[in-house]
Amino acid sequence: MSQPKKILFITLSNIGDVVLTTPVLIRLAQIYKNARFDVVGDQRSEMLFKHCPFINKFYRKDKSKGFMGTLNLVRRIRADHYDLAVDLRSDGLLYLIRADKKFNKVKNNNIHSAEKHFLSIKQPTNLMPKTEIWLNKQEKIDARKLIPKGYKRILALGIGANSEHKIWPAQFFAELASMLQKNFDFILIVGDSRDNKFVPIFKEAYGGEFLNLCGKLDLLTTAAVIKNSELFVGNDSGLGHIASAVQTKTFTIFGPGEPHRYRPWGEESYWVQDKQKIIQEIKPALVFKKVMDAFGYDDEQ
């Protein structure tokens, strides 16, 4: 096959999963510098790829439209003929589109998902780029405006998740924030509107000044806020992956998940998990110690 000029990239849906596929897309763009990239994903992945400089077209999958919506999507994609198609989802779409060469996802549950995705394009993992989220100038400006002037060392907390078994108690986050506050100028909470129910519990237990941004920002402005933060501490959710992708120090508190496969990818991404995978058994003092040890903060400040 000659150098591909048209490449179709089929990504995933959940925020964290999408972030973990970005090294594949970035590497393909490095190899095939003159190629046109089209991407298939859902509304969340479309937002994450909004400012990606080498994407030509985005095909949005919408489960709510059912079979006819899927059929229409296939027809639209089949109107084009691709030199290469890479499918990291494996829901059958790869077999319905037209492409000279096709790569499917690798089945290996013993390695990290970022590495597994990368192996699908037959590249050695030592060439794997970092995960990435693309932000524009306005998102960065809007994020900076939210932080009081003079505050530079920001601690961002992600106190929600999409499953109750993944949620560390809000009062524990408050205790941790109290322990860490002398190392930071300001504390803020990020998340979607569903996470607001945890904020009153945090507020009562913490008692200090903080900014609640849950449900107030779009995904990319939230990413820009996290990028402006020195450290992100949160539950096993997409926000931890976003933090790592914008090169912010990241610490994840795991419940029943599998850190060896799904932890945020990056050299400054750390995590903790109870041996029985019961998140409520992880005490704030333990998280504090691990954060201090991981990132070298001074306990005597």
Task: Give residue spans per PLM region.
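Catalytic machinery of carbohydrate-active enzymes
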Residues: M1-Q301
